[in-house]
């Protein structure tokens, strides 16, 4: 190895350079937007980090026309509690089709705290392994097809997207790495918005 470095100009691969990133930078950058969030069918995604130290809240909007939008709404240490998150979600029950919540620590408590408000069947979703793989595919496909955008000032979401790696899961893969929590929450929100049959924004017409 030392000889190769000195004589041949060869260096051992650096992990950061060879890591199997989940989202190519050029594809992510092509979906950046400076336009404000559109109106449309809305869902929220909540992801507790693997070590339980952080929680990310994201939203996704699918308008009648044009690309969907994903947004990082908040990212906080779980040491601050989750009362703020439960209150925030309960205040917006009438505006969203669903909230998708995933993680090991904090999920049960959050679901319990919003249960009295989020009563509609299917409004609170706890994704299975299959759902997590599907949510990842939903976001990556949307990025590849340029059918989703993200706001250019969302640096935390940007950093998460560009540093997340592919993590094997149940025969497929999902987002992984030390900073994947925001992009995971975004994928859950978009998947929820696309698959939920509930849409509070639509007024039923009779006759």
Report the location of each language-model feature.
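Conserved structured core elements
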Residues: 1-5, 51, 76-86, 104-108, ...
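ATPase catalytic-site recognition across NTP-hydrolyzing enzymes
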Residues: 1-46
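C-terminal nuclease/phosphodiesterase catalytic domains that cleave nucleic-acid phosphodiester bonds
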Residues: 6-10, 14, 58-59, 109, ...
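Flexible loop/turn segments at secondary-structure boundaries
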Residues: 14-18, 50-55, 65-68, 80, ...
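Nucleic-acid-processing active sites and adjacent nucleic-acid-binding tracks
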Residues: 28-38, 51-105
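Short, conserved catalytic or adaptor-binding loops enriched in Gly and charged residues
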Residues: 34-35, 114-117
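Active-site lining segments that contact anionic ligands and/or coordinate catalytic metals
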Residues: 40-43, 52-55, 96, 170, ...
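A structural signal for short, well-ordered beta-strand segments and their strand-loop junctions
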Residues: 45, 100-102, 151
């Amino acid at each position: 190895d030392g000889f190769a470095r000195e004589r041949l100009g060869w260096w051992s691969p650096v992990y950061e350079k060879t890591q199997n990133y989940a989202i190519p930078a050029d594809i992510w950058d092509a979906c950046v937007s400076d336009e404000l969030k559109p109106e449309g069918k809305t869902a929220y995604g909540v992801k507790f980090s693997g070590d339980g130290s952080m929680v990310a809240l994201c939203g996704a909007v699918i308008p009648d026309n044009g690309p969907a939008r994903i947004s990082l709404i908040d990212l906080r240490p779980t040491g601050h509690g989750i009362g703020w998150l439960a209150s925030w979600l309960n205040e917006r029950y009438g505006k969203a089709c669903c909230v998708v919540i995933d993680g090991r620590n904090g999920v049960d408590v959050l679901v319990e705290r919003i249960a009295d408000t989020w009563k509609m069947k299917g409004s609170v979703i706890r994704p299975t392994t299959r759902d997590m793989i599907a949510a990842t595919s939903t976001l990556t496909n949307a990025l590849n097809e340029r059918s989703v955008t993200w706001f250019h000032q969302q640096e935390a979401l940007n950093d998460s997207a560009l540093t997340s790696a592919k993590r094997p899961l149940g025969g497929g893969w999902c987002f992984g790495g030390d900073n994947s929590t925001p992009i995971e929450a975004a994928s859950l929100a978009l998947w929820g918005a696309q698959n939920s049959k509930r849409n509070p924004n639509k007024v039923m017409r009779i006759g």
